A protein has these predicted regions:
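Intracellular juxtamembrane helix-capping segments at the cytosolic ends
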Residues: 130-145, 347-361
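Hydrophobic core of transmembrane alpha-helices in multi-pass small-molecule transporters
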Residues: 25, 94-95, 101, 109-133, ...
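Cytoplasmic membrane-interface "Motif A"-like loop-to-helix N-cap segments
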Residues: 75-93, 183, 296-310, 398-401
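Juxtamembrane intracellular "pre-TM" segments in multi-pass secondary transporters
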Residues: 2-14, 210-242, 431-464
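C-terminal ends and interior cores of transmembrane alpha-helices
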Residues: 88-113, 177, 308-328
Length: 464
């Protein structure tokens, strides 16, 4: 009887892993048609740099703080699947008031302060409802995919990335067309409604996905203050501190790349889309390779490699102003920069998430993910706030505006954080030794065709 039950459980887990791939594709519609275009929408509604910094970063902090509610829900025995599909359903509904704000702005000329405040409120609610899902979903997926985490999520993220890229490209074409006929708001209505449909499908799939039995045990619970006190002695605590500080550094500049392109570089929506598509495209190609590498050599090895690449990206963005008189060269240069960005972020995002699965026990997964996200959210908010205040300074030197200061400060702090924190963190599982000389030797023996073949090879089929 036990054997039959085990076989049924394994079948349901495999089926759930396949549903999760489709759910990820639906999420890509939300991301590519919706979330990626919130900053351009805010600019259309007249928000300044400081407000945009708050718009992008404050919801991240609020969304992570409300994850403490998730822990309470789990403690009360509410199923992880219920938390996930209800949270995503409520998140879906927030697109209607966000669209309504634009309609009020363009049809009734309502005060900009009221519109900006409304956008912050409803976008914050959208992120909060999504944030509540995070710890429950991570714990849930940890039970479904107990082995080869890197390989599975490398493949899943590739599917999400492909959907996101196609969605972004389509959204860019829609916005460019309606801007050309002097109706940009109509374009945003269309892409946000498609984002709504994507998240609605995602929510429905989460409701169908199998959830293994889970009974939270109070002896595994610890407060956030207990967690903070143990950070100096805890390897996981040091890892959380590193990622949170990196998010602080990243969010000094992250909310303003769109502003930099649309204002300083005077890009149209299609040019903006081509540049912003590059990183998720490279992500899609490289995540499976990073997943295989991490499964063999450890997640921390990838974090160290990519963590030292991240400081270069905003510094290279600053140099784009020198190509402003050569638009084609400027586009090619930024595509190169975003290719490097995709290389770094593909590995960093995948392995920082997967490190948690290696470092944390099943019983403590939800609580550790919640605390991890809270630290990240606080870092994001403080970074975005500081970046926004600097970006609105009346600074101009040669071709450099205050946004250039924001980018350079972000680069400097990223470098400092990686240099100081990475040596303090250790790998948490047995992995193969990585020899840089051997890696260089193997790479030198590969032709460009070989490299493309490796990148295009699937990283394993989650159905098997």
């Amino acid at each position: 009887m036990t054997g039959s039950h085990d076989r049924k459980t394994e079948y349901l887990k495999k089926k759930a892993s396949r549903i999760s791939i489709r759910e990820g594709a639906a999420y890509g519609l939300l991301d590519g048609f919706g979330l990626r275009y919130i900053t351009p929408y805010a600019l259309l509604l007249g928000m300044n740099n400081t407000l945009i910094g708050i718009l992008i970063s404050l919801p991240q902090m609020l969304g992570t703080l409300t994850q403490l509610l998730t822990l309470k829900f789990l403690e009360k025995g509410i199923r992880r699947r219920t938390i996930a599909w209800v949270g995503t359903f409520l998140q879906t509904l927030m697109w209607f008031p966000i669209i309504l704000l634009g309609w009020l702005h363009f049809n009734f000329n309502i005060d900009n302060t009221l519109i900006s405040t409304g956008l912050m409120v409803f976008y914050s609610l959208m992120v909060i409802f999504g944030g509540i899902v995070g710890p429950a979903w991570s714990s849930w997926m940890g039970d479904i995919i107990p082995r080869q985490i890197g390989t599975y999520f490398g493949f899943r993220n590739r599917v999400v990335g492909l959907t996101t890229i196609l969605a972004m490209f389509s959204a860019g074409l829609i916005l460019q067309y309606f801007t050309g006929v002097n109706r940009p708001f109509t374009g945003f209505v269309i892409i946000f409604l498609i984002a709504f449909i994507g998240r609605a499908i995602s929510s429905a799939l989460l409701k169908r996905q199998y959830e293994p039995d889970f009974h939270p045990q109070k002896e595994y619970y610890f407060t956030i203050w207990q967690f903070i006190r143990k950070i100096p002695q805890s390897n996981f605590g040091k890892f959380v501190t590193y990622v949170a500080l990196m998010q602080f550094a990243v969010y000094i500049s992250s909310p303003f790349f769109a502003v930099f392109m649309l204002k300083d570089l005077h890009f149209n929506y299609f040019q903006f889309t081509l540049i912003t598509m590059t990183m998720p495209f490279v992500n899609m190609l490289l995540m499976p390779a990073w997943g295989r590498f991490a499964d063999r050599f450890g997640n921390l090895r990838v974090v160290r490699i990519t963590g030292l690449c991240l400081p270069v990206i905003p510094a290279l963005w600053v140099l784009a102003v020198f190509f402003s008189n050569r638009p084609i060269l400027e586009m090619l240069y930024l595509i190169f920069v975003e290719t490097l960005s995709g290389f770094a972020w593909a590995g960093f995002n995948l392995t920082t998430a997967n490190f948690i699965y290696d470092a944390v026990t099943r019983q403590r997964m939800a609580i550790c993910v919640a605390y991890y996200n809270i630290f990240n959210g606080i870092g994001m908010f403080l970074g975005g706030l500081i970046g926004g205040l600097i970006a609105d300074l009346p600074f101009q030197f040669h071709k450099f505006s205050a946004l250039a200061l924001v980018l350079m400060l972000s680069a400097l702090i990223r470098l400092l954080v990686s240099a100081v924190m990475l040596p303090l963190i250790r790998e948490v599982r047995e992995v193969d030794h990585f020899d840089i000389k051997e890696a260089r030797k193997r790479l030198s023996m590969l032709s460009p065709v070989d490299i493309l073949r490796v990148l295009s090879t699937k990283s394993g089929n989650p159905r098997n």
